[in-house]
């Protein structure tokens, strides 16, 4: 560290790499290889991208990290659906416990001194899984595509100038009919898909998965949606009180109103590219937006966004230009 006593001698740090150095750092045989989360990281903060993917500094792993819990929960659902197909939402308590117990067997062997803590995690995940399956039962009952693939590996190439952009990753779930398919991505929160987030590069996953799956399977894309694994309960208030009158009045709230609120909150959020109601018994499974792009618009815009982000990366940009509050939970802060 250098103590600077005169402001006239201070220079603002230049957060940039030379283009030559950036090429050596990020390119291999004229190919830029990256995951979707990598591009999203750069869109959110170029400096974090440089630290993570240029310097290869990884953040410490914490068992209590909510992202790790989400990954475990995701894998539990994947195991259940592989074993029981669409009937995974009908499994009993013992079947759920067996799957979760198997997930933690290795951890118990490696960390015998943490067995009680691990058992507590199993119980917590058991309760959470049961609640999630109850919530997903309504969707699976009224949704009539079949689960085709889970954790499907993909790679997608975009020719650009005299080089290639190679994107790769895993698609959580692909459902299909004879002619069409739909993409689902599991999330631990109530994530929504917004056009603004897609256009600024911070929400590219569903779009990329859809484009890659269409290229691989040559089926018609009907939509791409998030499946929320958040299991927060909806509070039922038996009465609504009006204090604006001299004598407060109460109005009874029927349980059906609360159930309708719950169903509304559990709609899957995302974009539809075709009339998705063809594959539904109910019209309240999905939340779709009027401004959702068509698939052709999506593909064209996606190529433009990805190439712009790649160009910015290779230009040497490592500035700390980040989203609001992005530093609050950043491992590199």
Map each language-model feature to its residues.
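Beta-sheet entry/capping signal
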Residues: 7-8, 14, 47-48, 144-148, ...
């Amino acid at each position: 560290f250098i103590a600077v006593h005169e402001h006239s001698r201070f220079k603002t740090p230049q957060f940039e790499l030379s283009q030559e150095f950036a090429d050596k750092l990020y390119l291999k045989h004229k190919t830029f290889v990256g995951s979707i989360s990598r591009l999203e990281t750069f869109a959110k903060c170029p400096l974090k991208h440089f630290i993570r993917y240029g310097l290869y500094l990884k953040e410490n792993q914490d068992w209590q990290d909510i992202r790790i819990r989400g990954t475990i929960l995701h894998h539990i659902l994947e195991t259940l659906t592989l074993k029981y197909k669409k009937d995974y939402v009908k499994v009993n308590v013992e079947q759920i416990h067996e799957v979760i117990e198997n997930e933690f067997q290795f951890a118990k062997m490696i960390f015998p001194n943490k067995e009680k803590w691990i058992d507590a995690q199993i119980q917590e995940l058991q309760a959470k899984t049961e609640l999630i399956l109850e919530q997903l039962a309504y969707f699976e009952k009224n949704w009539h595509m079949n689960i085709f693939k889970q954790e499907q590996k993909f790679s997608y190439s975009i020719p650009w100038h005299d080089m290639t952009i190679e994107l790769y990753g895993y698609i959580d779930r692909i459902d299909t009919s004879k002619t069409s398919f739909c993409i689902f991505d599991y999330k631990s929160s109530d994530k929504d898909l917004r056009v603004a987030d897609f256009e600024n590069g911070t929400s590219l996953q569903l779009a990329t998965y859809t484009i890659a799956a269409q290229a691989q399977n040559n089926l018609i894309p009907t939509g791409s949606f998030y499946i929320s694994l958040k299991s927060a309960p909806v509070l039922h208030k038996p009465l609504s009180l009006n204090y604006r009158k001299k004598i407060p009045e109460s109005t009874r709230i029927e349980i059906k109103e609360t159930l309708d609120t719950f169903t509304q909150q559990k709609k899957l959020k995302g974009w539809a590219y075709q009339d998705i109601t063809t594959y539904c018994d109910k019209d309240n499974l999905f939340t779709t937006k009027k401004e959702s792009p068509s698939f052709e618009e999506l593909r064209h815009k996606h190529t433009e966004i990805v190439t712009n982000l790649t160009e910015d990366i290779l230009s040497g940009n490592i500035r700390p230009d980040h989203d609001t509050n992005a530093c609050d939970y950043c491992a590199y802060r």
